[in-house]
Amino acid sequence: MAEHRTKPSELDQGKCDADDNVKIICLGDSAVGKSKLMERFLMDGFQPQQLSTYALTLYKHTATVDGKTILVDFWDTAGQERFQSMHASYYHKAHACIMVFDVQRKVTYKNLSAWYTELREFRPEIPCLVVANKIDADINVTQKSFNFAKKFSLPLYFVSAADGTNVVKLFNDAIRLAVSYKQNSQDFMDEILQELENFNLEQEEEDVPDQEQSGSIETPSEEVASPHS
């Protein structure tokens, strides 16, 4: 089980190897409550960082999974979702996705299909958790059947950022699934992107006179990932 232990500022990040870091992205229409959910989960133990260059907000969090310290980067869209599409860099090396809709606005549920299609274009295998937010407005929605999650065999969470219902469970499960994905399977999309990156660097080096060349290209270790449950 994943649980909050300490603030990132209190952790000696240098002691953590690369496997102790995961990236979790949030998707969904504007105003469905993505940021509010993160703030509810992290409460006072977060320091959101606005990255205007990439039009996103980054939330850092520290969790413990099976006795191991995990540094978690939660990526929020910061308004970019109003264009109904995200830049490819938003998806790059993400280990799990939290996809949110507002139970009071049917259009946000209908748009899940478009978000999911784009997600799978860049991250074909990562775990995706579907979130029905704002159930505090009408608890009866928890009795409804949302076929989108069933169609793609995705876990569905009924939550409320307002009163905290199921928020901790949602994020703890997302962290656990992200860690499992990273540790247990290979994501070929990352391999392809890395190969293209290396190829471009090699091409650039070929264009530079021998006497001006310096440094070397390091091949990163393979990132593993597993079929999500």
From Swiss-Prot:
<keyword id="KW-0342">GTP-binding</keyword>
<comment type="similarity">
    <text>Belongs to the small GTPase superfamily. Rab family.</text>
</comment>
<dbReference type="InterPro" id="IPR001806">
    <property type="entry name" value="Small_GTPase"/>
</dbReference>
<dbReference type="InterPro" id="IPR005225">
    <property type="entry name" value="Small_GTP-bd"/>
</dbReference>
<dbReference type="Pfam" id="PF00071">
    <property type="entry name" value="Ras"/>
</dbReference>
<feature type="binding site">
    <location>
        <begin position="133"/>
        <end position="136"/>
    </location>
    <ligand>
        <name>GTP</name>
    </ligand>
</feature>
<comment type="subunit">
    <text>Interacts with IFT27, IFT81, IFT172, ATP6V1E1, HK1, LDHC, MAPRE1 and HSPA2.</text>
</comment>
<dbReference type="InterPro" id="IPR027417">
    <property type="entry name" value="P-loop_NTPase"/>
</dbReference>
<feature type="binding site">
    <location>
        <begin position="28"/>
        <end position="35"/>
    </location>
    <ligand>
        <name>GTP</name>
    </ligand>
</feature>
<keyword id="KW-0547">Nucleotide-binding</keyword>
<protein>
    <recommendedName>
        <fullName>Rab-like protein 2A</fullName>
    </recommendedName>
</protein>
<feature type="region of interest" description="Disordered">
    <location>
        <begin position="200"/>
        <end position="229"/>
    </location>
</feature>
<dbReference type="InterPro" id="IPR041835">
    <property type="entry name" value="RabL2"/>
</dbReference>
<dbReference type="GO" id="GO:0005525">
    <property type="term" value="F:GTP binding"/>
</dbReference>
<feature type="binding site">
    <location>
        <begin position="76"/>
        <end position="80"/>
    </location>
    <ligand>
        <name>GTP</name>
    </ligand>
</feature>
<comment type="function">
    <text>Plays an essential role in male fertility, sperm intra-flagellar transport, and tail assembly. Binds, in a GTP-regulated manner, to a specific set of effector proteins including key proteins involved in cilia development and function and delivers them into the growing sperm tail.</text>
</comment>
<dbReference type="GO" id="GO:0003924">
    <property type="term" value="F:GTPase activity"/>
</dbReference>
